[in-house]
Amino acid sequence: MITGIQITKAANDDLLNSFWLLDSEKGEARCIVAKSGFAEDEVVAVSKLGEIEYREIPMEVKPEVRVEGGQHLNVNVLRRETLEDAVKHPEKYPQLTIRVSGYAVRFNSLTPEQQRDVIARTFTESL
């Protein structure tokens, strides 16, 4: 369990009024802020703090954001010129199939606006 503390008495003056997170399971302390002697986010053994007195600090725990599944990537192995030519001459590309949002779609079945959107989003100069 992790407990937030403010050190109120210590043999080491650098620890006085410093804030720490104590991990009782690991026997470790993480420095949140101290006058000197300890770096922010430094992790030390609790025993390194020596004899101390402290008061517990209430902590607000925010829920973790969990992403299930991961990323999604559509790969279309085409040249920009091929799609632009398919817009101008759809009769030459009756079987041209692309991936849009995970679905296979015939390019010619898209509206002109959707075709322009696919070309704009598929071919970028930089991120």
UniProtKB/Swiss-Prot annotation:
Q: Where is the Glycine radical domain?
A: 5-127
Please give the superkingdom of this protein's source. Bacteria
Which keywords fit this entry according to its UniProt record?
A: Organic radical
Cellular component GO terms, alphabetical: cytosol
Please name the Gene3D superfamilies in this protein's record.
Answer: 3.20.70.20
- Where does the record place the modification Glycine radical? 102
- One example GO MF annotation: formate C-acetyltransferase activity
User: Which NCBIfam families does UniProt cross-reference here?
Assistant: spare_glycyl (TIGR04365)
What the protein does comes down to: Acts as a radical domain for damaged PFL and possibly other radical proteins.
Q: What is this protein called?
A: Autonomous glycyl radical cofactor
The scientific name of the source species is Salmonella arizonae (strain ATCC BAA-731 / CDC346-86 / RSK2980)
